[in-house]
A protein has these predicted regions:
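Class I SAM-dependent methyltransferase Rossmann-like catalytic core
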Residues: 44-52
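Class I S-adenosyl-L-methionine
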Residues: 12-26, 182-215
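Conserved beta-strand signature within the Rossmann-like core of class I S-adenosyl-L-methionine
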Residues: 170-177
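Short beta->alpha hinge that forms the Motif I/post-I loop of the SAM-binding pocket
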Residues: 105-109, 155, 178
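N-terminal auxiliary segments of SAM/dcSAM-dependent transferases
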Residues: 1-36, 46
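A short glycine-rich, Lys/Arg-flanked "PGG" loop and its adjoining helix->strand segment in the class I
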Residues: 157-169
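Conserved SAM/SAH cofactor-binding pocket of Class I
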Residues: 55-136, 142-145
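A short SAM/SAH-binding and catalytic strip from SAM-dependent methyltransferases
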Residues: 141-154
């Protein structure tokens, strides 16, 4: 089970989706249960969930630990969009050690910390990148994400349209979204965009959504 989950939303005065955070560094450590044991991660000011594991990601990891996903072929590409310090990406990497996981974030401090966390936990199958650094021809078998809802509706829709289009024809995305921040309307929007979306769990105010491809 994830540990050190904060009881409130991250109150950072600077947006976690800023490309170059200027907030003074305030490192924190937290632990999560990976697929093969405990993982220890660092986070920092100016990065999403600067005090430890946030509620949404905690719910997501608990749900996905028990969810029966379709088999993924070794050598496939997987990704975490908006990786932050890397809790989701590192979990993916431990669950699918024969696949390559792209941990993607616009925030350079988040990318730096995610790289450190991957090295610290001896995970060599993670590539940390900005969105522009990911080859657009890559097709992903799986995407896991706690998407950056607070970037605004239009920007969020643009982000999801871009990345869902990079799913393989049999690919599946799993997202966690706060139900009070539009989870149900977002699910409807994705379904209408030819990405059939279903709710696989609802817990502690969050929805976990499964998104498939209809091409």
């Amino acid at each position: 089970m994830p540990k050190n989950t904060p009881s409130s939303s991250d109150p950072s005065p600077q947006h976690y989706f800023s490309e170059s955070p200027q907030a003074p560094s305030r490192r924190k450590e937290f632990a999560i249960s990976g697929h093969v044991g405990e993982l220890t991660l660092s986070t920092d000011a100016g990065v999403f969930s600067q005090y430890g594991l946030d509620k949404g990601t905690s719910v997501f990891l608990e749900v996905m630990a028990k969810h029966e996903c379709a088999p993924i072929v070794p050598g496939s590409f997987l990704c975490d969009i908006g990786c932050g310090s890397g809790a989701i990406a590192l979990t993916l990497a431990t669950r699918y050690p024969d696949c390559t996981v792209y941990a993607v974030d616009t925030n350079e401090r988040a990318r730096s910390i995610c790289k450190e966390n991957a090295v610290r936990n001896n995970l060599g199958n993670i590539i940390v990148a900005s969105p522009e650094e990911v080859d657009p021809s890559i097709r992903f078998a799986s995407m896991w994400s706690n998407p950056p809802i607070r970037i605004g509706k239009s920007a969020l829709h643009e982000l999801l349209e871009t990345w869902l289009a990079r799913l393989a024809n049999d690919g599946v995305a799993h997202l966690v979204v706060n139900k009070n921040l539009g989870a149900d309307s977002l699910a409807d929007w994705m379904s209408n965009l030819s990405y059939p979306t279903s709710r696989i769990a609802s817990r502690n105010g969050f929805r976990v959504l499964e998104v498939t491809v209809d091409r």
